[in-house]
Every structure is written in structure tokens, then in C-alpha cells.
Amino acid sequence: MSTDISPPYSQTHVEPVNGYPSDNKRCDDSSVPAKYDDLVRNSALFWEKLRAFLGLTSKTLKVPTVGGNTLDLHRLFIEVTSRGGIERVVKDRKWKEVIGAFSFPTTITSASFVLRKYYLKFLFQLEHVYYLEKPVSSLQSTDEALKSLANESPNPEEGIDEPQVGYEVQGFIDGKFDSGYLVTMKLGSQELKGVLYHIPQTPSQSQQTMETPSAIVQSSQRRHRKKSKLAVVDTQKPKCHRSGYNFFFAEQYARLKPEYHGQERSITKKIGHMWSNLTESEKQVYQDKGVKDVERYRIEMLEYKSSHESGATASTVAQ
């Protein structure tokens, strides 16, 4: 996701950072020699030089967003260079300090990786020429810089606290079975595959929920609702269709249960891994069964609805 900033001088306010006062006079001549201190103090000059380095003198500069907010590249440039530059920040593991200058949502667990990526893409050249005061001819490519920094820090998240319980992550469901789901989750730059399962309630857990009077009342109400639901269950209603994974799970569960007696969690995880390792042709065998079961369910539901409609009509006539 990106945000159009046109012209770049729209960022007309910069808070004093590291002792540098704010000075937002517009620079009308990009050919005027500039120094690092000038870019720090003058945000308009910073944006003009950045556009020139990116070759966007006549185009709109698309500034990236992080956590739903536009990333302040000027602030990022100051925070990194004031700590010795990108190489020093990575080597000394100072990304946490840099991130502290921004108000990112707590759900972002890969902020250091994201900031490093955008710094290399947008600001690496400015640092090389204006902060390190090296000639443009000695500037290595962004890809080479990325490889070099990767060797310095094999873990892009170094210096960042580990994700805590309660963090939100994005993902999708690959398959469903009786005890849970096969899922793929995205955590920063990593893509993780696993099993999301429901832990069955044990008798000891049930006993704990009934230790207080309020728990007894709630438990009684739940039992009452459960009995009410059981009382209205239609035993003639067709059994819901199953997916290809459901057929695979049932087959493997019956095979593994004697070997892993009482280890429901282990069985579930093992079957999930087995399904993930199947080839597409092997999965297709079970998916075909799922397609047939969907058709079975459709036909049985038509018959079920037809019989109920005829029964309701007969009841109305009798009245």
C-alpha cells in the first residue's frame, strides 16, 4: 500500500530531532550544493534531493505506509544516520531505538525488517552521499547492500521483543477437520504452516468451572440450553457433507488411534503433517470423495425438504 505525496513539500513541519531545529524553507534550485546538516534541518530540501536521487523530478513520489500511516522518510533518515548509518544500526542492533521514534501499532511484529527494507529502497543513496560524504561512483547497488547487511545480521528482527500473546496475525485456512483447521499464518516476512485445533474439555476442567455459585448457575443454564437443543434435533435431516480432508482424517485417525491411544493432540498434528506432505494427485483422490459427498448431501437435502413440505401440507389440510 502506498500514499501519493505531491508535491513532496507538503510535509512542512518537522519536529526538532537530536538537537536540529526545524527549518522548512523551500529549496527552488536542486543544483545548489547541500550538506547533511542541511537535509536534516530543511525537510523541503530533503524531499527535493530524495526525488532527484530516485529520478522522480517530474513524477509523484509514492511514500510507503506502515501500520496504516504514512512513513515519515525524513524522520527515518534522521533516526538512522544519527546512530551512525544503516550499517551501524544493524550491527549494533539499534532498530528498537529507531522504531521507538515512530508510533507503530503493537500488532506490527516485523517493524525492523520493514524499516530496513524501505531505508535501503529510498534513503540508502542519500546516506552514502550526504552523511558518509562518499562519491556517487562508489555507491553499491541496493541489492549488494542488502546482501551485505544480511550477512551482518542473519535475523532481521534482532533487537526486537518477541511477539507476545494477544498479537494479531494474518492467515488463511487450508483445510478443516473435526478437531480444528490446517492453517497458514504470516508473521512478518515468515510464512508458517500448522494446525489450529480445539482442546477438548477434561473432567477436571469441568469441575473447576463449578467451584463458585455463579459458575454453578452458568453451568446449569448451559446444560438447560444443551438439553433444549437436543430436544429439537431432527434425526432425519441429512448428515452434512465432508471435505476431502475430512475423509483423509477419518481414514488416518482409525489407523493411528491404536498406536497413539489417548494422544488426540499428537494424532491430530501427525495427520495434519501427513496431509501437507501429500502430492496434488494423492490429495485429489480424497477431494473427489468430497465432491461426491457434496452431491450426496444436495440430493438428500432436496428429498428431505420435499418430504417436509408435503408433510406440512397434509397437516394443514387435516386442521
From Swiss-Prot:
Molecular function as annotated in GO: DNA binding; DNA-binding transcription factor activity
PROSITE patterns found in the cross-reference section: ARID (PS51011), HMG_BOX_2 (PS50118)
Biased composition, class Polar residues, residue ranges: 1-13, 203-220
CDD domains: ARID_HMGB9-like, HMG-box_AtHMGB9-like
Swiss-Prot/TrEMBL keywords: DNA-binding, Nucleus, Transcription, Transcription regulation
Region called Disordered, residue ranges: 1-25, 203-230
Subcellular location as annotated: Nucleus
Chief location bin: nucleus
Free-text tissue specificity from the UniProt record: Ubiquitously expressed.
Domain ARID, residue spans: 40-131
Pfam families: ARID, HMG_box
InterPro entries linked: ARID_dom, ARID_dom_sf, ARID_HMGB9-like, HMG_box_dom, HMG_box_dom_sf
GO CC terms: nucleus
DNA-binding region: 238-305
UniProt function note: Binds preferentially DNA with A/T-rich content.
Protein name as annotated: High mobility group B protein 10
Organism of origin: Arabidopsis thaliana (Mouse-ear cress)
Gene: HMGB10
